């Protein structure tokens, strides 16, 4: 029987994706490590790998493969938070009719049966980096508009109307964004995509 040992995730939700690691341990100190790539822009669980009793180097290499490219901090999560994320993003796969990645028998029970009072909004402070600068906030929200990320737009605006606005007919890719300060708290965002 495996017991929860620890979990951590990147705080990169504002970029549309995050990495999640859940580490389990049994009474004989055997480790089972689960690595999930969570995609909020329509894929749900985008990638999954597991390692049984990895060496420290193997675990580190897989963590860096999953999380290194985000350039984000890694934050500790509780068992409840980490299992909620697997269930939440895994259910997106069903909603968008996308295949579950990797050996789904290792996590399908979490998706189908894990129950909690958590909501994705309750986790935003952990899974999103703190944004202190106005231009940085504009850049992130521009990315969310182009990606049709209604969930983030609703969270940050508090408005269904803004969350349902879009500037592309399908999820787009942001190529560049130039933000000009026009003074008095006004900005112009010039965006080729």
Where are these regions (language model features)?
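Non-catalytic terminal/accessory regions
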Residues: 1-193
């Amino acid at each position: 029987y495996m017991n929860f040992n620890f979990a951590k995730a990147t705080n990169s939700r504002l970029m549309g994706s995050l990495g999640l690691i859940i580490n389990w341990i049994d009474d004989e100190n055997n480790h089972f490590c689960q690595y999930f790539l969570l995609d909020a822009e329509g894929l749900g669980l985008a990638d999954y790998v597991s390692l049984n009793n990895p060496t420290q180097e193997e675990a580190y290499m897989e963590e860096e493969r999953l999380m290194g490219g985000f350039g984000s901090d890694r934050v500790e999560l509780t068992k409840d938070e980490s299992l909620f994320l697997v269930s939440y993003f895994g259910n997106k796969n069903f909603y968008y009719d996308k295949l579950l990645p990797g050996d789904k028998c290792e996590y399908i029970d979490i998706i189908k049966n894990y129950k909690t009072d958590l909501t994705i909004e309750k986790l935003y402070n952990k899974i999103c980096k703190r944004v202190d600068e106005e231009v940085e906030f504009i850049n992130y929200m521009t990315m969310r508009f182009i990606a049709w990320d209604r969930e983030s737009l609703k969270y940050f605006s508090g408005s269904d109307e803004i969350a349902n606005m879009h500037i592309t007919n399908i999820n787009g890719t942001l190529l560049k964004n130039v933000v000009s300060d026009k003074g008095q708290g006004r900005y112009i965002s010039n965006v080729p995509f």
